Swiss-Prot record:
Catalyzes the ATP-dependent conversion of 7-carboxy-7-deazaguanine (CDG) to 7-cyano-7-deazaguanine (preQ(0)). InterPro entries: QueC (IPR018317), Rossmann-like_a/b/a_fold (IPR014729). It comes from Synechocystis sp. (strain ATCC 27184 / PCC 6803 / Kazusa). Keywords: ATP-binding, Ligase, Metal-binding, Nucleotide-binding, Queuosine biosynthesis, Zinc. Its EC number is 6.3.4.20. The lineage of its organism: Bacteria, Bacillati, Cyanobacteriota, Cyanophyceae, Synechococcales. This is 7-cyano-7-deazaguanine synthase.
Amino acid sequence: MTKTAVVLLSGGLDSATVAAIAKREGYRVIALSFNYGQRHDRELRAAADIVQALGIPEHFSINLDLAQWGGSSLTDRQQTLPQTGVEPDIIPSTYVPGRNTVFIALGLSLAEAKGAEAVFLGINAIDYSGYPDCRPEYLATYQQLAALSSKVGVEGRPIQLLAPLIELSKVDIVHKALELGVPIAQTWSCYAGGEEPCGRCDSCRLRDQALIEAGHPELASAKGRLWREKVD
């Protein structure tokens, strides 16, 4: 019997890698993306490209205007995106209040409606340690809620929340993506709006550094490479 899983697919490197992992593990993948008012909505085109590249049969996209109330530099264009790198124990301004909690709830809804056994998430606690909704304890607590709040959970068949990258470094994720044939060049991680990665935002810096350390500087952003050359 074919297993089915919902994958929360942003269009970034992490979620694309998770989609490839789900496919390798034998799941029929249903992708779920969100247009939530993020300034980097370019990632939605990347999500569609990844769906095609990986041969994912179903892709849903939901509109959620979280930009209405702001609270994050990802949804409020009046705020400046951080460019100083991730700092331990500091929650960055790119944290979107309640975003993962809402996304996972909708992923669980889709999974239950489609008879899926799991929801795969691309959250990571190593490089994004400042995000409270990317921690293992957050995921474990949400798993309990998933079991209590759904028909299948009450019947003893709770939908599993799976985050295979949660304790991997960004370099390890790059290696995993390469191993699985993820089209890294088609993924999008930049937080800034535009058609080319800015190379300066925290997400670009983490991604580019990981690609360079993994031995693939050619996959790093062009602007990021130029900026690093000037700094060095």
